[in-house]
């Protein structure tokens, strides 16, 4: 028998049952009629209990009775009875009640009480994936817990599961990919998993003879993210907002807002002696708190509210972004580079095992010689490292690190990983997996595979943008600091960046076109191609710029016009796409390519990006994090920051209501710094793996579960994966994302992302501490402006001064480059024309093709700049 409950109430849900439980849960307004639990059942409840001091027993209910709008499931045990009621409510909720009753004459201790939440997580065809499959989001944090599900396309409606008051969630486990258990009580299963760590207590409860206890959840339908926040508030839970994120540099202030029906009773810091926590203000049902951490690593703030209820905010306190940039780059060049002229991989930046404290390579492979051999000397785990080091040195040059990069280029890249300009055909081609040495030696290659042995293995699209970025960043170092570069002059490095970008669009399609589609897939780091185009034009090479522009615009046309769901890369649905999708949409708007179509695509890709990103989950490893299908085993990969760049830039430039996206984008920027093992002497030089010899190591991603198996094959306790692997790809996005943002936030008032804000009455003062010190944005409802530097940095000693009426900005610029610094001003919303004075003299302005005002600052190490806006 099947019952459609939505016909009996408000037409919000389509629900049906079979003999095993609820087998359909569909929002009635869903245009695709997607069944969230297709192939699964709601109603599976795990109960482990003891009668007095007896042995553990289990109870598993099964369906018993259907009665009109209600569905009752009773599990009959000799001592403990489980009753489940599913009922459509008049307010549109679909309620799931669970009752436990002790029918024995003895006390019963309930050690586990968990509900299984199935969901349809994928499919084959694009329509099945993007329209009828879902990504699970979960915030497991006591009495403020919830789950929600987003379609892969990001299109509403969104489905929420909100616990009733008195139904806290404290733990989760994932036995299979679609078998997610959310625990109300976990005193048995939690400690039973002795591997890994967990930040919340594992509790149980005792039922006296004749006593019963009820728990419950309500399914809700939401049409937007603000509506999901309202659902949490109306349900008696907590709507949380935070700036600048849940990963906070030491000494910088974070502010969080708690919107809730029950005012907080108290807040408790995990390390009260090293935490400054205070209530800033309350207005109505919203309470703003300021917090500043001195204890490096994870920090809990526990919120007590509503007569015994509680939830925890999981923060991470890191070193400053600049310190972390420097530590990571130094660690790579000092501890992760092989230098042995007798080895074919001389110059390689290898992968580092934080747990063992060992550098892995082809002759020290750990288990990577059995599977994932590419992990050691090719592919994304390797090719993101040198571009990151180069990008850091294009901003903060270090002669020893530049020498390391030149050694890498000379001994590993040019003529090894990458074919030279004299190796015809396929000059500038980049060798793929398992490594360039095997692919250059046909006899070795034949021992690995018999696939396309007649074809040169330079077809992997993803490799090309990494190598292009390496040449591009090396070019910028040579352009701005020519005395520090000995490997090749700037013009040679620019040529190699151009040629690598050119063949990126050619060779993969030419050699393996049945699989690789460079015009149809998003590839990390390819967003730099428009910058390369602009530089070629500036350097008097318009023909080369035109070649790349033609290819980039071909890709733009495909993404905007030819594919409804171009959110793929290596997988049919792939979060890797969400750097390229936004970059292409922005290119269309900046260059006047059908602005209406470009803007429509920008909005669609933005919400698809949010679908695989933690938006409402306020734990440092989930807020702003990316994940695929769910965050259970893997979160905070390279796309947290790479895709987070697009969220932040969208908020700064294009969003009608920017503040949610600035918050989220900045959280995505800061969050992955928590994957770094870095500290000072007092902290043991690393929260995750202490030891000075590991200061600057990095984890590829984060295991959210107490214990899990990473896809790279390692077993990981909750925390960063032990190998750096692809994590340095995320570091590649630091220098293009970092900014100080002064925003007039409707929730928090004037706030500063990337520094400490001082209010002097008529003006604001701050020193940018974002890690790069080359970008400042000022955002209000009426005006948005951006200031950026090519070469040089904002002063680390003299503060930026901004008049509160936004009529003037005063900057101090420090330049160590061997060419003049260029200041750029852009008005992103409203009207503002800058008048710039430096050293008492007016500076002439030139406007570039994007409408930015460009000012060349006088040569010298120091410049005081006054900007008047009119």
Q: What annotation goes with each model-predicted range?
A:
Residues 215-216, 344, 348-399, 404-820:
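Catalytic domains of carbohydrate-active enzymes that cleave complex glycans
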Residues 86, 98-102, 210-223, 305, ...:
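Short, hydrophobic/aromatic-enriched beta-strand segments in well-ordered soluble domains
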Residues 112-121, 188-190, 194, 269-274, ...:
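Short acidic, flexible loop segments centered on an aromatic residue
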Residues 10-179, 193, 197, 201-205, ...:
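Beta-strand-rich N-terminal accessory domains
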Residues 72-90, 223-241, 793:
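Low-complexity, acidic Ser/Thr/Pro/Gly-rich terminal tails and inter-domain linkers that flank the onset
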Residues 213, 241-265:
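Solvent-exposed, low-complexity, repeat-rich "mucin-like" stalks and linkers
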Residues 262-298, 304-306, 727-730, 737-870:
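C-terminal beta-sandwich/jelly-roll accessory domains of carbohydrate-active enzymes
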Residues 123-127, 230-251, 311-353:
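Low-complexity, Pro/Ser/Thr- and charge-rich linker/hinge segments at domain boundaries
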């Amino acid at each position: 028998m099947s019952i459609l409950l939505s016909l009996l109430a408000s037409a919000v849900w389509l629900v049906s049952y079979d003999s095993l439980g609820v087998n359909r849960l569909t929002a009635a307004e869903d245009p695709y009629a997607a069944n969230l639990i297709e192939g699964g059942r709601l109603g599976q409840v795990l109960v482990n209990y003891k009668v007095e001091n007896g042995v553990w027993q289990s109870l598993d209910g099964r369906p018993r009775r259907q009665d009109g709008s209600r569905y009752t499931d009773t599990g009959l045990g000799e001592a403990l009875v489980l009753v489940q009621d599913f009922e459509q409510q008049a307010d549109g909720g679909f309620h799931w009640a669970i009752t436990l009753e002790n029918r024995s004459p003895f006390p019963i201790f309930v050690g586990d009480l968990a509900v299984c939440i199935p969901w349809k997580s994928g499919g084959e065809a694009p329509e099945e994936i993007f329209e009828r499959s879902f990504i699970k989001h979960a915030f497991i944090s006591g009495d403020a817990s919830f789950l929600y599900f987003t379609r892969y396309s990001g299109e509403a409606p969104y489905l929420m599961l909100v616990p009733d008051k008195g139904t806290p969630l404290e733990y989760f486990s994932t036995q299979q990919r679609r078998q997610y258990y959310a625990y109300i009580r976990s005193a048995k299963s939690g400690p039973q998993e002795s591997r890994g760590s967990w930040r919340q207590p594992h509790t149980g409860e005792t039922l006296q003879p004749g006593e019963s206890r009820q728990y419950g959840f309500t399914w809700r339908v939401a049409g937007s993210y603000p509506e999901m926040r309202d659902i949490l508030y109306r349900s008696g839970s907590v709507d949380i907002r935070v700036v600048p994120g849940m990963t906070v540099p030491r000494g910088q202030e974070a502010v969080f807002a708690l919107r809730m029906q029950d005012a907080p009773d108290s807040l408790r810091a995990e390390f009260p002696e090293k935490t400054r926590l205070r209530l800033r203000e309350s207005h109505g049902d919203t309470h703003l708190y300021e917090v500043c951490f001195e204890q490096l690593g994870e920090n809990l703030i526990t919120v007590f509210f509503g007569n015994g209820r509680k939830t925890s905010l999981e923060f991470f306190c890191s070193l400053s972004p600049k310190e972390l940039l420097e530590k990571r780059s130094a660690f790579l060049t000092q501890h992760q580079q092989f230098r042995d002229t007798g080895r074919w991989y001389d110059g390689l930046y290898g992968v580092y095992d934080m747990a063992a404290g060992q550098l892995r390579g082809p002759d020290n492979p750990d288990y990577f010689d059995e599977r994932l051999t590419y992990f050691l000397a090719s592919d994304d785990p390797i090719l993101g490292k040198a571009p990151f080091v180069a990008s850091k040195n294009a901003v903060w040059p270090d002669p020893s690190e530049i020498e390391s990069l030149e050694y890498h280029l000379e001994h590993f890249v040019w003529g090894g990983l990458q074919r030279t300009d004299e190796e015809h055909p396929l000059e500038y081609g980049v060798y793929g997996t398992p490594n360039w040495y095997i692919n250059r030696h046909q006899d070795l290659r034949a021992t690995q595979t018999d696939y396309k042995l007649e074809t040169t293995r330079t077809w992997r699209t993803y490799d090309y943008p990494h190598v292009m970025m390496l040449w591009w960043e090396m070019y910028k170092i040579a352009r701005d600091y020519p005395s520090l570069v000995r490997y090749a002059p700037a013009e040679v490095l620019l040529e190699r960046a151009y040629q690598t970008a050119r063949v990126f669009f050619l060779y993969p399609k030419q050699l393996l076109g049945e699989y690789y589609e460079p015009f149809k897939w998003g590839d990390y780091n390819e967003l730099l191609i428009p910058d390369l185009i602009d530089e070629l034009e500036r350097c008097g090479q318009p023909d080369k710029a035109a070649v790349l522009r033609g290819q980039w615009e071909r890709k733009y046309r495909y993404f905007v016009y030819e594919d409804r769901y171009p959110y793929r890369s290596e997988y049919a649905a792939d979060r890797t796409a969400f750097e390229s999708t936004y970059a292409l949409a922005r290119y269309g708007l900046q260059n006047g390519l059908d602005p209406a179509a470009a803007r429509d695509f920008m909005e669609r890709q933005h919400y698809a990006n949010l679908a695989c990103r933690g938006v409402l989950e306020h734990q440092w490893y989930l807020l702003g994090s990316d994940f695929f299908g769910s965050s259970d085993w893997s979160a905070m990969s390279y796309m947290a920051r790479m895709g987070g760049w697009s969220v932040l830039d969208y908020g700064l430039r294009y969003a009608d209501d920017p503040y949610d996206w600035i918050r989220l984008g900045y959280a995505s920027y800061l969050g992955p710094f928590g994957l770094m093992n870095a500290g000072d002497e007092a902290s043991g030089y690393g929260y995750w793996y202490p030891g000075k010899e590991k200061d600057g190591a990095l984890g590829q991603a984060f295991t959210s579960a107490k214990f899990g198996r990473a896809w790279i094959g390692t077993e990981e306790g909750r925390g960063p994966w032990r190998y750096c692997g692809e994590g340095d790809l995320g570091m590649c996005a630091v220098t293009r994302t970092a900014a100080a943002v002064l925003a007039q936030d409707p929730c928090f008032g004037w706030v500063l992302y990337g520094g400490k804000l001082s209010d002097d009455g008529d003006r604001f003062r701050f020193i940018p501490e974002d890690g790069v010190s080359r970008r400042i944005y000022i955002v209000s409802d009426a005006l948005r402006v951006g200031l950026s530097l090519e070469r040089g940095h904002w002063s680390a000693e003299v503060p930026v001064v901004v008049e509160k009426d936004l009529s003037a900005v005063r900057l101090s610029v420090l330049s160590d480059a061997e060419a003049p610094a260029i200041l750029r001003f852009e008005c992103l919303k409203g009207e503002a024309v800058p008048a710039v004075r430096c050293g008492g003299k007016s500076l002439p302005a030139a406007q570039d093709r994007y409408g930015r005002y460009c000012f060349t600052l006088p040569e010298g190490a120091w410049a005081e700049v006054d900007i008047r806006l009119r």
